[in-house]
């Protein structure tokens, strides 16, 4: 899942981004509404965590632009006000969900995941292929009935490959979906992660390298 965090309180924005990355999400961060519009114009996001009171361009206008463009991106709006009238106004503007500050991080994670499920093409709750079972909600992976412990990025890469249902996924696509845009496009992090993932999943190998194209399961 790819998420854009838009929050002018930099410490809060960075803390939210760090927490989401620990949940195997690819996260970009900006600190004002103008930068948010720029990112939305060039990148596809599943969810935007959007502070309402932003400098340069107000969060309401960012939300309106997402709706105007007809994007499938879901918006979780944040605000310092918990007034019912503010929540209603935010939802009427086009936000999909609303979370007043201060908030419990566990609730933020749950709401982002719920919005991400609404963005994605409906799939079975548990993904199964080639003897592998992957539960996106419980963050669990099993190979032939035996649980496999994966790091967040390993889980994210495996989930992308499982969701492709046998189609080839390029290294560039994996980099885009499992990492954020600040990752060096010439890095070998995808190859290294796939190698580690293969080792953890055991024999016989289930991740196939398609020379010049990418990987598939």
Swiss-Prot record:
Keyword Phosphoprotein: yes
Pfam families assigned: Response_reg, Trans_reg_C
GO process annotations (BP): regulation of DNA-templated transcription
UniProt-listed InterPro entries: CheY-like_superfamily, OmpR/PhoB-type_DNA-bd, Sig_transdc_resp-reg_receiver, WalR-like, WH-like_DNA-bd_sf
GO molecular function, one term: transcription cis-regulatory region binding
Any coiled-coil regions, as ranges: none
Keyword Transcription regulation attached: yes
One CC-aspect GO term: protein-DNA complex
DNA-binding region coordinates: 124-217
Ranges of residues in domain Response regulatory: 2-116
Record keywords, A-Z: DNA-binding, Phosphoprotein, Transcription, Transcription regulation, Two-component regulatory system
Residue positions, PTM 4-aspartylphosphate: 51
Domain of life: Bacteria
CDD domains, per the entry: REC_OmpR_CusR-like, trans_reg_C
Protein's job: Member of the two-component regulatory system CutS/CutR, involved in the regulation of copper metabolism. CutR suppresses a defective melC1 gene, encoding a putative copper-transfer gene, probably by altering copper metabolism.
UniProt-recorded name of the protein: Transcriptional regulatory protein CutR
């Amino acid at each position: 899942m790819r998420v854009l965090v838009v929050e002018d309180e930099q410490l809060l924005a960075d803390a939210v981004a760090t927490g989401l990355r620990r949940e195997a999400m690819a996260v970009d961060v900006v600190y004002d509404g103008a930068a948010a519009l720029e990112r939305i114009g060039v990148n596809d996001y599943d969810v935007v965590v959007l502070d309402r009171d932003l400098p340069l361009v107000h969060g309401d206008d960012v939300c309106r632009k997402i709706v105007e463009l007809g994007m499938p991106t879901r918006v979780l709006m944040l605000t310092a006000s918990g007034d019912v009238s503010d929540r209603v106004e935010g939802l009427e503007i086009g936000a999909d969900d609303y979370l007043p500050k201060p908030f419990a991080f566990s609730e933020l994670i749950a709401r982002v995941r719920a919005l991400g499920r609404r963005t994605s093409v409906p799939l079975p709750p548990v993904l199964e292929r080639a003897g592998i079972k992957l539960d996106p909600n419980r963050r669990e992976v099993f190979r032939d009935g035996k649980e496999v412990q994966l790091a967040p990025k390993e889980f994210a890469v495996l989930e992308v490959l499982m969701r492709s249902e046998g189609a080839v996924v390029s290294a560039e696509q994996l980099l885009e979906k499992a990492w954020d845009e600040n990752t060096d496009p010439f890095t070998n992090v995808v190859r290294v992660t796939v190698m580690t993932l293969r080792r953890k999943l055991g024999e016989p190998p289930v991740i196939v390298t398609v020379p010049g194209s990418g990987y598939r399961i």
